[in-house]
Structure formats: structure tokens, C-alpha cells
UniProtKB/Swiss-Prot annotation:
Active site: residue positions: 258 (proton acceptor)
Family label: Belongs to the glycosyl hydrolase 4 family.
Protein's recorded name: 6-phospho-beta-glucosidase
Family matches, as Pfam families: Glyco_hydro_4, Glyco_hydro_4C
Organism ancestry: Bacteria, Pseudomonadati, Pseudomonadota, Gammaproteobacteria, Enterobacterales
Induction remark: By N,N'-diacetylchitobiose.
This protein's GO CC annotations: cytosol
């Protein structure tokens, strides 16, 4: 790493950026970021300007010697960067609303990282991430790209499957939330060493063991969650329903809250349909929260991250991002839960898959934790199904072909009819036209047929 530490945040006008900056300020003594560049696109400029002003006030208030820059020119920012964080949303929140509302209008779950909605977020995002990777390879080839952009698993799979770039790590806040839940319910002290055996795919992870100071307390934790005495960890954008005792005991694993979309599909769909018919979707809630946040951010007296940001649903985002960068920069060999290719360490899945699992993180990036060599056979059917969906989705994002989109939709367990898959594909490709430039030929054909 260079003497100066330059971090570039793509999607710098995001409402999450103050949390990221707060994380850098808190860790400045061991992670001395000298330059932070905030990059956005023309459509995000008004938000970028507000975020930049707030971040400058936060830096001045903290008294750290960090230089802050803003630009719409990604290439200008990337030159000689050490770390690049990606937190972009192609099409911004209006595109997310389409991802949620169109599937719901056909009677299917509408969610930005699963099913039809997750597919179309991936189709919009993957080509943009590939463009960023190309720029990184040219302008800062030794930089690490730390990706927070959803769907993180699909994006990581696409980068490793279709590019030669190897310094890419997909990060999610869900495992951090699970870790904080465990610390809380087991009443651990800061000095207690907590190690978690976590495995699966992004937004489809399971915990199979929890070690406190080297001793397993998983049975106690599982029993508490199964019996309902311990309330399992959830996130802001998912309705809080408990998994049944029978499911938890039969799995003998702790599933993350996103698995509600698979194990409680009927209940989750009923709740979402109820919200939809009342005229609401999660994207609309988020847009209201965002509007309020940016009004707060404009206040020239505000010099710290406001507490209201926690309503946005990105809890522990800062800890996840900053600690990953910290572990690499300082060669900490610390335990993290990230998306990477496992390179054959897991003996019962293909060697080239990107997975989300417990890893050791240091100067050379992330390596799978030596303790985890086998994914639990009980959930391998579901994992294989979703990985097939991710691979098909990443292929479709590159090809721009209607039939590749159709294949991905038909492989998703959240789409139950081949006829509906075709209707969804047509409607969603046309709805997202301006954000799917590599589907231009496909869109022209669809319009002609229409």
C-alpha cells in the first residue's frame, strides 16, 4: 500500500456515505485515510453536493487530516486509489420501485435482491460494475474493490466468472447483524473471542457453529432461537416473522432473515401483497426516509451522522466496510464474512463458485476459513438452485438476450409459472429500458412484437 491512503467511493451521493465516513473517522488512528473521493453520476449530483458538504463538516468537526473530493468523473477519482468501494444503485430508487411493484402486480414477491426484482437489479448493475473494474485495472490495478452493491452475490459471481480481475470482495451487512445479535443474546464481553462458522450464498447464509473463546455455544443459541426465548436477528427491510421451531430444529442451523423469502414464502407474499394493495412498497418507504434524511443533511449545524440514518436499513454497513479495508490494510488476518470464490476448499460444491462464508482477511485479500471445508448437505438443494439462478442472471446481464433472462426467471424458486416468467421478462425489460443499454436489440424486438 502507498504511504498515503486513498479511498474512492462510487455512489458517493448515497445516504449511507455519512456512516461510511464516520467509520473511517473512528478508525483514523489505524486506518489513516488521507483522501476520500466521492463519485456519482449526473443524476445524483444534487445528493452528492449535499453529502459532500455534510461530510466536510464531519471531517472538520473530528479534526482529522483527511482531504475530501467530489466528482462526476470516475476516472479522475480512480487514479492511484488504494481501495474502491461501490455502493451504487443503477436507476436509483424509482428502478427499485419497479423491481418491487411489477412482480407484485403478477402475484409474486417483489424484492430487490431475490426473485424477479433481484434479477433485474443484477441486469442493470453488472455491466456498470464491469465498466468500473475495467477502469480500476487501468488506473489503479493494485486497488481492492470492496463491493456493497446488491445483489452482492450475483455481482461477485459475475466478476469472477466473466473478468480476470481478482481483487474484488463482496460485502454484506447481514452477517454482521447476525454476529451482533449473538454477542447481545449471549451477553458477551468485548474481550470475549467470538468465531462463527457461517456459509452459503449472499442473502442465503446459515450459521452452523458459534465458538466463544474456543468453546462451542451453538446448541444453547439454537435452542433459544427455536424455542422463541431468543428473538432472531432481522433487518429493516424485511418483515419480522419468526422461523418455526420445527424448521430450526430440523435444520440444526441458524438461517439469516432473508431466508424468510424461501421458508415462509406464503406468509411473506401475503404481507407484501397487503402493502401493495394499500399502495405501498418498500421502495416508497425508503424514498420517504431518504427525503427526510437529505433535509436533515442540509442543516449547516449538523456535523455528525444523524441517528435517523438507522431507519434506512443499512445497520452495521460502516463496520462491515471499514473493518474489511482495515483488515487488508493492516494485514490483520481477521475473521470476516464475505463473498469470494472458494477455489475448491469446499468439497461438495463446484470449485469456481463464489460463495459467502467465514474467511480470514489480510494483505492478500480473503481466504476461506480453514475450519469450513463442507457445506451442510441439508440445504445444498436450495443453494444449488439459487447459484444456478445467479449464474444464469450474470450470463443474461452480459448477453442482453431475452431467452437468457427467461431462463434465469424460470430457474428462480420465487417464480412459479413459465408463462408468468415470460410476462415478467417482457414487462420488466421494457420498464427498465433506459437502464439496460445492452438490451437495445432485445427491446427493439419486443416493441415491434407489441
Amino acid at each position: 500500500m502507498s504511504q498515503k491512503l486513498k479511498v474512492v467511493t462510487i455512489g458517493g451521493g448515497s445516504s449511507y456515505t455519512p456512516e461510511l465516513l464516520e467509520g473511517f473517522i473512528k478508525r483514523y488512528h489505524e486506518l489513516p485515510v488521507s483522501e476520500l473521493w466521492l463519485v456519482d453520476v449526473e443524476g445524483g449530483k444534487p445528493k452528492l453536493d449535499i453529502i459532500f458538504d455534510l461530510c466536510q463538516r464531519m471531517i472538520d468537526n473530528a479534526g482529522v487530516p483527511m482531504k475530501l473530493y467530489k466528482t462526476l468523473d470516475r476516472r479522475e477519482a480512480l487514479k492511484d486509489a488504494d481501495f474502491v468501494t461501490t455502493q451504487l444503485r443503477v436507476g436509483q430508487l424509482p428502478a427499485r420501485e419497479l423491481d418491487e411493484r411489477i412482480p407484485l402486480s403478477h402475484g409474486y414477491l417483489g424484492q430487490e435482491t431475490n426473485g424477479a426484482g433481484g434479477l433485474f437489479k443484477g441486469l442493470r448493475t453488472i455491466p456498470v460494475i464491469f465498466d468500473i473494474v475495467k477502469d480500476v485495472e487501468e488506473l489503479c490495478p493494485n486497488a481492492w474493490v470492496i463491493n456493497f452493491t446488491n445483489p452482492a452475490g450475483m455481482v461477485t459471481e459475475a466478476v469472477y466468472r466473466h473478468t480476470g480481475f481478482k481483487r474484488f470482495i463482496g460485502v454484506c451487512n447481514i452477517p454482521i447483524g447476525m454476529k451482533m445479535f449473538i454477542r447481545d443474546v449471549l451477553m458477551l464481553k468485548d474481550s470475549d473471542d467470538l468465531s462463527i462458522d457461517l456459509f452459503g450464498l449472499n442473502h442465503m447464509v446459515f450459521i452452523k457453529d458459534v465458538l466463544i473463546n474456543g468453546k462451542s455455544r451453538f446448541a444453547e443459541l439454537l435452542d433459544g432461537v427455536a424455542s422463541g426465548q431468543l428473538k432472531a436477528s432481522s433487518v429493516k427491510n424485511i418483515f419480522d416473522l419468526p422461523f418455526s421451531e420445527g424448521l430450526i430444529r430440523s435444520l440444526n442451523l441458524l438461517p439469516c432473515s432473508y431466508l424468510l423469502y424461501y421458508f415462509k414464502q406464503k406468509e411473506m407474499l401475503a404481507i407484501e401483497m397487503g402493502e401493495y394493495y394499500k399502495g405501498g412498497a418498500r421502495a416508497q418507504v425508503v424514498q420517504k426516509v431518504e427525503k427526510q434524511l437529505f433535509e436533515l443533511y442540509k442543516n449547516p449545524e449538523l456535523k455528525v451522522k444523524p441517528k435517523e440514518l438507522e431507519q434506512r436499513g443499512g445497520a452495521y454497513y460502516s463496520d462491515a466496510a471499514c473493518e474489511v479495508i482495515n483488515a487488508i490494510y493492516n494485514d490483520k488476518q481477521a475473521e470476516h464474512y464475505v463473498n469470494i470464490p472458494h477455489h475448491g476448499q469446499i468439497d461438495n460444491i463446484p470449485a469456481d463458485w463464489a460463495v459467502e462464508m467465514t474467511c480470514k482477511l489480510g494483505r492478500d485479500g480473503a481466504t476461506p476459513h480453514p475450519r469450513i471445508t463442507h457445506f451442510d448437505d441439508k440445504v445444498m438443494g436450495l443453494i444449488h438452485t439459487i447459484k444456478g439462478f445467479e449464474i444464469a442472471a450474470s450470463n443474461a446481464a452480459l448477453s442482453g438476450e431475452f431467452n437468457d433472462v427467461l431462463l434465469a426467471l424460470n430457474l428462480s424458486p420465487l417464480v412459479h409459472s413459465d408463462r408468468d416468467a415470460e410476462l415478467l421478462a417482457r414487462e420488466m425489460i421494457l420498464a427498465h429500458e433506459k437502464w439496460l443499454p445492452n438490451f437495445a436489440d432485445c427491446i427493439a424486438e419486443l416493441k415491434k412484437a407489441h
